[in-house]
């Protein structure tokens, strides 16, 4: 299984609980996602002026980009209550009914990993989202009867890392779909600098840049790296985090200049050395690395693709010349036109 202790995993870890202090409290403090942020501000202002519930919102994007933070900000900007849960926690229709019937007018209900809701729960959610009603079956057999329960008008905010797993009826009920993208180095520098101020740690511009460059476009990882580099700076009695301290700390933590860790380098090296740079199927890679396919597709590969180290093709995974250069390996000779011919997703 993917090691949850990976410093650069975008998934939540136990030590990320300290991130709460680093999170922005409103849209004006939120760095990055400019278009999404601007549109959200318009929709929130309009709903507030009309004193109506905001349309249902769906946040789509890789882990660690701020979906939960934005959901909390939406509720805070609207001045309403906030309830949070996740798809796997809502095991049956009764669990969802208990959540919905306890919402006040215009409250925000946040469901993380909404793509993991069961079909039975989704069926109950549809009329709740559309008509603000619950249609429940009470009893069993001939004595069973349908009961309608009126709900307060609420806003459902869903978050998913895998939009393709959402059913069309569920996706279509979200009036405000918002896609979140990886952050630029400049945006992450601002996030790191703000985080250092919140933590009471001095940091230079080049120190913030060094951490930002290795944060894989992800604020959650930037905050995690900042906390670990701060430990190295404290141990060295340094007044501030500069590039030298950041480089030393991240090198000791095996996070290289491109933000790759040992798992990333192992993935790339396996394709390069064992399969001649590819193409190689994802199932083969899953077996070679003893990792589940989902972990490879959702956690390992997105950043490698973003950086231009990897292509997904109909024939399998294919390393780019950039990947061989990063690994310090000679690129094998390929058939003319083999690289870059296939831009689609792997089918197998």
Swiss-Prot record:
Keyword presence, Cytoplasm: yes
UniProt-listed SUPFAM superfamilies: P-loop containing nucleoside triphosphate hydrolases (SSF52540), Winged helix' DNA-binding domain (SSF46785)
Reactions this protein catalyses: ATP + H2O = ADP + phosphate + H(+)
Annotated GO biological process: DNA recombination; DNA repair
Annotated region described as Small ATPAse domain (RuvB-S), given as residue ranges: 184-254
Primary location recorded for the protein, binned into one broad class: cytoplasm
Keyword terms: ATP-binding, Cytoplasm, DNA damage, DNA recombination, DNA repair, DNA-binding, Hydrolase, Nucleotide-binding
GO CC list: cytoplasm; Holliday junction resolvase complex
Family: Belongs to the RuvB family.
HAMAP family hit by this protein: DNA_HJ_migration_RuvB
Assembly and binders: Homohexamer. Forms an RuvA(8)-RuvB(12)-Holliday junction (HJ) complex. HJ DNA is sandwiched between 2 RuvA tetramers; dsDNA enters through RuvA and exits via RuvB. An RuvB hexamer assembles on each DNA strand where it exits the tetramer. Each RuvB hexamer is contacted by two RuvA subunits (via domain III) on 2 adjacent RuvB subunits; this complex drives branch migration. In the full resolvosome a probable DNA-RuvA(4)-RuvB(12)-RuvC(2) complex forms which resolves the HJ.
Protein name: Holliday junction branch migration complex subunit RuvB
């Amino acid at each position: 299984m993917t090691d949850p202790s990976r410093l650069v995993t975008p998934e939540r870890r136990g030590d990320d609980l300290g991130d709460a202090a680093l999170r922005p409290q409103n849209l004006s403090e939120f760095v990055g996602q400019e278009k999404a942020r601007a549109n959200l501000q318009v929709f929130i202002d309009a709903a507030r002026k009309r004193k109506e519930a905001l349309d249902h919102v769906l946040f789509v994007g890789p882990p660690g980009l701020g979906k939960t933070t934005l959901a909390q900000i939406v509720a805070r900007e609207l001045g309403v209550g906030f309830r949070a849960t996740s798809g796997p926690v809502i095991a049956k229709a009764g669990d969802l009914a208990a959540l919905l019937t306890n919402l006040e007018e215009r409250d925000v209900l946040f469901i993380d990993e909404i793509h993991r809701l069961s079909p039975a729960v989704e069926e109950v959610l549809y009329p709740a989202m559309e008509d603000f009603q619950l249609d429940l079956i009470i009893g069993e057999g001939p004595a069973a009867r349908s009961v309608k329960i009126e709900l307060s008008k609420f806003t459902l905010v869903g978050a998913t890392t895998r939009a393709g797993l959402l059913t069309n009826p569920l996706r279509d009920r979200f009036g405000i779909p918002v896609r979140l993208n990886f952050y630029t180095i400049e945006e992450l520098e601002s996030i790191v600098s703000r985080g250092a101020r919140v933590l009471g740690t001095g940091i230079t511009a080049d120190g913030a840049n060094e951490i930002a460059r290795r944060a894989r476009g992800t604020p959650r990882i930037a905050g995690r790296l900042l906390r670990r580099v701060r430990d190295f700076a404290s141990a060295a009695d340094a007044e501030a985090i500069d590039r030298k301290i950041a480089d030393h700390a991240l090198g000791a933590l095996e996070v290289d200049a491109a933000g790759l860790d040992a798992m990333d380098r192992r993935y790339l090296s396996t394709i390069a050395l064992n399969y001649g740079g590819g193409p190689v199927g994802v199932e083969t890679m899953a077996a070679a690395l003893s990792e589940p396919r989902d972990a490879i597709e959702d956690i390992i590969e997105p950043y490698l693709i973003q950086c231009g180290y990897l292509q997904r093709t109909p024939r399998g995974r294919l390393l780019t010349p950039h990947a061989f250069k990063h690994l310090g390996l000679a690129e094998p000779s390929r058939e003319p036109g083999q690289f870059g011919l296939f831009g689609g997703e792997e089918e197998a």
